């Protein structure tokens, strides 16, 4: 999606909040991590967060999971770049469900994609991984 198109209301809100803050406090923009967003896409918003469907897909069709994560990563980068352009002072990526993965799977299916995000964003503003 085009952040200044379909999500223009978010960027307008960022610009308005930034203006109203008058530099008193930093404004932090944010997005979910590709892994976390993918789990919501696969599992839906409810459930007990055991991620059965997602884990089944990870282990049975890892190439397809990587395709999804690549698409989501590109969207997250675009969204965060737009927030930065709208005036945020820092960016945060929330990896809420990264802990659902074993260490090796975490590196492959979550950390790898957050690394791509950090590299794409550069160092114009701080980027926080949480």
Walk through the language-model features, giving the residues of each.
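Active-site loop segments of alpha/beta catalytic cores
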Residues: 6-130
């Amino acid at each position: 999606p085009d952040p200044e198109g379909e999500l223009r209301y978010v960027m307008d809100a960022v610009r308005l909040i930034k203006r109203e803050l008058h530099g008193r406090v930093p404004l932090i923009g944010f997005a979910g991590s590709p892994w976390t967003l993918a789990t919501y896409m696969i599992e839906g918003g409810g459930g007990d967060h055991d991620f059965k469907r997602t884990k089944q897909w990870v282990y049975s069709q890892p190439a397809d999971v990587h395709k999804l994560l690549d698409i989501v990563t590109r969207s997250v980068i675009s969204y965060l770049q737009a927030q930065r352009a709208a005036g945020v002072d820092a960016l945060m990526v929330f990896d809420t469900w990264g802990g659902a993965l074993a260490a090796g799977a975490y590196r492959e299916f979550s950390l790898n994609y957050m690394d791509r995000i950090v590299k794409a964003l550069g160092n114009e503003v701080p980027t926080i991984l949480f």
